[in-house]
């Protein structure tokens, strides 16, 4: 593992703790780090009070929810593919990784990883489809995207240290599933090395490559998505501060849950009692002397209130440090200017992430087009995160501009699409073709009506028709 990757992992660990799929289980497995043992929590006679506190702890997934909502806002609308071969829209976008993952699902996951660790990557690879029958034509290479998370990075190498130097090697870790016995299976750690025009695969316990082969491209087909770039293949998690607050919330919540668990059971005190019975409960009674006193001792609720207030404060801090406007909403009255400033700040972060993702998708499609040998499409990700719906008067003004020829019909449809007047499942290209056809039919109908009117209209210079009495034509007057 490269030293650069090793250093970045130190910052990634806190993010991995609060965003991993295992969630609370991961913190339980690493409780000595994230929920340290207190001095008096000493295991004795098989009882470990610290382990009891760990077992009651639960992680509130604040950071994970922040990231998921941020990615959802960026990809609120489906990614649009313009131009290129129809194969991209008809087939590829439905399965971009060879396992049935759609383009939108794949892009959302890549963006979530980038917002978590500061960057994410993908490898553009291709496989050859063999003809099913002898007479079938040879199918061109079928490209697909391979997701690579920062936690898989092992290292990279470039030609030199100059800016823009060519990437000559990229190494990352993966798990290979192998059969074990008749019905079982096992996972083996392996390192994949990609160099221009070739790849190699090494298993953890074997010094020689277990698999190797050529690549159709003469460069390393790696595409990176940055959210907090520090350098080439180097980034820092943008939500690290929020992650530390999330861990602080986890610790305080663990203390509160454990305290409530202990304090919920009161302690029975018997004064001047000489008996030996120690069993109490709803089905038991205690025989006491007339001078014996019995009462329950309970904890003061003031300490619990203070812990609950601290938890509320931590939750508010996490909300205010969120990068999305949804999770940063304030449930108090605000001025219009304050709301506008918050909106612009949120849009700035989301727009930057959207542009990074859009550039990465276009670069990936360019590489996939080289594999396929066809023209790649252009991916367009909506930059509108305001949920702003066009008003009726806005649509009327835009329609007037389109009729006067100041904007095109295609632009009008795009504005109405982003303004949520055109449903998302409507094909804009098909809609444009239908509108043009309707306009041509309406124009033709108007021309036909004009010709028909010209045929029945009196010729120019002809005398007006006389009335039946032979005089001038009778005029009708309407009294007002």
Provide a role label for each language-model segment.
Residues 88, 99-107, 114, 241, ...:
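Short amphipathic alpha-helical segments
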Residues 206-338:
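Extended, charged amphipathic alpha-helical segments
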Residues 107-111, 126-130, 253, 257-264, ...:
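Long, hydrophobic, amphipathic alpha-helical segments used as structural scaffolds
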Residues 123, 171-173, 287, 380-386:
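Residues in well-ordered beta-strands of folded domains
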Residues 115-228:
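Extended, regular secondary-structure scaffolds
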Residues 274-277, 306, 313-480:
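C-terminal helix-loop subdomains that flank or include functional centers
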Residues 1-143, 148, 454-455, 459-480:
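Extended, helix-rich architectural segments
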Residues 51-55, 59, 76, 110, ...:
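Conserved aromatic-histidine-acidic binding/catalytic patches
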């Amino acid at each position: 593992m490269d030293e650069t990757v090793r250093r970045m992992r130190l910052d990634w660990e806190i993010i991995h703790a609060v965003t991993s799929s295992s969630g609370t289980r991961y913190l339980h497995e690493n409780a000595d780090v994230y929920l340290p043992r207190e001095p008096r929590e000493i295991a004795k006679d098989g009882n470990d009070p610290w382990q009891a506190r760990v077992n009651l702890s639960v992680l509130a997934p604040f950071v994970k929810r922040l990231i998921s909502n941020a990615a959802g806002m960026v990809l609120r609308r489906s990614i649009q593919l313009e131009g290129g071969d129809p194969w991209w829209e008809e087939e590829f976008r439905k399965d971009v990784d060879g396992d049935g993952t759609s383009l939108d699902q794949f892009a959302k996951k890549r963006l979530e990883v980038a917002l978590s660790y500061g960057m994410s990557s993908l490898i553009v690879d291709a496989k050859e489809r063999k003809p099913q029958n002898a007479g079938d034509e040879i199918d061109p290479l079928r490209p697909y995207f391979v997701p690579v998370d920062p936690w898989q990075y092992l290292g990279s190498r470039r030609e030199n240290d100059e800016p823009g130097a060519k990437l000559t090697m990229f190494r990352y870790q993966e798990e290979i599933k192998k059969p074990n016995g008749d019905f079982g299976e096992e996972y083996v750690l392996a390192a994949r090395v990609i160099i221009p025009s070739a790849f190699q695969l090494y298993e953890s316990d074997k010094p020689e490559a277990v698999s190797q082969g050529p690549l159709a491209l003469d460069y390393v087909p790696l595409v990176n998505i940055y959210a907090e770039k520090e350098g080439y293949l180097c980034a820092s998690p943008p939500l690290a501060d929020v992650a530390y607050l999330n861990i602080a919330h986890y610790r305080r919540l663990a203390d509160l849950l454990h305290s409530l668990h202990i304090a919920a059971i009161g302690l029975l005190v018997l004064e001047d009692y000489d008996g030996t019975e120690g069993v109490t409960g709803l089905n038991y009674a205690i025989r006491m002397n007339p001078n014996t006193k019995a009462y329950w001792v309970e904890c003061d609720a003031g300490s619990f209130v203070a812990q609950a207030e601290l938890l509320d404060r931590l939750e508010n801090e996490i909300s205010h440090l969120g990068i999305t406007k949804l999770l940063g909403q304030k449930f108090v009255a605000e001025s219009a200017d304050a709301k506008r400033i918050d909106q612009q700040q949120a849009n700035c972060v989301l727009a930057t992430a959207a542009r990074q993702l859009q550039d990465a998708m276009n670069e990936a499609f360019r590489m996939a087009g080289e594999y396929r040998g066809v023209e790649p499409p252009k991916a367009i990700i909506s930059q509108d995160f305001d949920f702003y719906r066009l008003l009726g008067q806005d649509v009327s003004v835009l329609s007037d501009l389109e009729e006067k020829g100041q904007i095109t019909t295609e632009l009008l449809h795009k504005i109405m699409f982003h303004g949520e007047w055109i449903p998302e499942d409507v094909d804009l290209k098909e809609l444009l073709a239908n509108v043009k056809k309707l306009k041509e039919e309406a124009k033709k109908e108007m021309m036909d009506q004009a010709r028909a009117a010209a045929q029945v209209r009196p010729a120019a210079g002809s005398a007006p028709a006389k009335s039946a009495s032979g005089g001038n034509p009778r005029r009708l007057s309407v009294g007002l």
